[in-house]
Amino acid sequence: MSIYSRYIFPRLMDFVMSSGQMSKVRAAVLSGVTGEIFEIGVGTGLNMPHYPKHVTHLTTADPNAGMSKLARNRIAESGIQVTHYTVGGESLPCKDESFDCVVCTWTLCSIPNVEQALRELRRILRPGGKLHFVEHGLADDEGVRRWQHRLTPIQKIVSDGC
C-alpha cells in the first residue's frame, strides 16, 4: 500500500465525505438497520454516529489500514462493539447467511471486482435480509456525464481507485 493510500487519502476522503449533506444521507440509509449488521467499506467510520441506538454490535471490513486507523475514535465514541476485518470485499471471512443487514455507503466504486463483492454480500446476507446502500454514478445530464468521463482518470488517482 502506498504512502498516499495509507496516510494522505484517508484524511482527504474523511474531509470530503463528512459534509452535512452526506451526514443526512447516511442517517437515512442507516435508519432501518436491525439484527446482525455487516458494513463493507467502513472507511474512517463516518457512519458510526448514524447507527440507531439499538445497534450494539457491528462487523466491518475495509482493505485500507489507514482508513481503519482513523475509524478507531469514531468506533470508540459510538459505544458499538465492532469486529473488524482488514480485507477487500471480494473474499469476506464470514459464514454464509450470517447477517440480517448489509451496509454499503459509497464503496462499490472502489472495489476492483464489484460483481464478486456483490456475490459475497449476497452470500453472507440471510434470506429476507436487506442491503442498505447508497452509491454515486453517472449523471443523467449528458454534459455532466461527458465531464465525468473526462475526469475519471484523474479521479481514480486522487480517490485511490474510485
Where are these regions (language model features)?
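C-terminal alpha-helical "lid/dimerization" subdomain adjacent to the S-adenosyl-L-methionine
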Residues: 6, 13-19, 132-162
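Conserved alpha-helix/loop element of class I SAM-dependent methyltransferases that forms part
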Residues: 16-36, 46
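Class I SAM-dependent methyltransferase SAM/SAH-binding core
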Residues: 38-40, 44-91
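A short glycine-rich, Lys/Arg-flanked "PGG" loop and its adjoining helix->strand segment in the class I
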Residues: 115-127
